[in-house]
Amino acid sequence: MSTEVVKEAKLEEEPRQCTKKEKLGHAIGVLGHDSMYTLWSTWTTPFLTDILKLPAGFLAFLFGGARFFDAFTDISMGIIADRTRSKWGRFRPWLLRSGPLMGICLALSFFKPDIGTIGLCIFAGIMYIITGSIVFTSVDIPFWSLPAAMTSNTKERSEIVGFTTTASNTITGIIGLVMPMALAFFGEFDWHVYFFLALAVAVWGVTMYLISFKLVREHVCLLYTSPSPRDC
């Protein structure tokens, strides 16, 4: 079996150093990325227990199974993203592909169909796995891999990550502050409130993903000489 030789190459004829607009674009992306994930990861459990009233045993099985499944999806998505070849680069296309899907899944995760307890268990279980283990993973790994493809300059990469982390902490704090207040005001035991709040965050999140996709550029990519993929 031939050994893969990884070589660094330019995606464009421009210098590898990214612009301020591109750095800003990545930070804008995390405003949508982490607002959706914070809402989902923090409020899914209260929704499943207090609103859908699913059995505790089922939830324990679901959460444990999801953690086990995550181990496979994380590795698989890393390989898929790294081997992606498109006119937009390796990681940037996933903002466009999986970003809108994350918004749809977020809203559906807080939807309550009238299908009985067993039906709700099936629906909630499917949405939990799809949202957290598949769709989120398919955008999270490429998103945080982008800085390495935006520039080959180590200092610039650190600046991008630092700027984006600051934006991440800010939006996480805002969601953590606003969500309890909104639930208390509109009705914390009404599933419609959860759904429409999630829908609002989903629209915001997808918009931020699309803006980020528009602003960010990949200037560095990995070319695999064996096997021979389509050129970046």
Where do the PLM segments sit?
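Symmetry-related core transmembrane helices of the 12-TM Major Facilitator Superfamily/SLC fold
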Residues: 195-211
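Hydrophobic core of transmembrane alpha-helices in multi-pass small-molecule transporters
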Residues: 118-139
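C-terminal ends and interior cores of transmembrane alpha-helices
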Residues: 96-117
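Central cavity-lining transmembrane alpha-helices of secondary-active solute carriers
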Residues: 61-81
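Glycine-rich segments within core transmembrane alpha-helices of 12-TM secondary carriers
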Residues: 162-177
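Transmembrane alpha-helix termini and helix-breaking/packing motifs in multi-pass membrane transporters
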Residues: 173-191
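Single conserved hydrophobic/aromatic residue that forms the stacking wall/gate
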Residues: 224-232
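Helix-loop boundary and gating motifs at the non-cytosolic
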Residues: 14-66
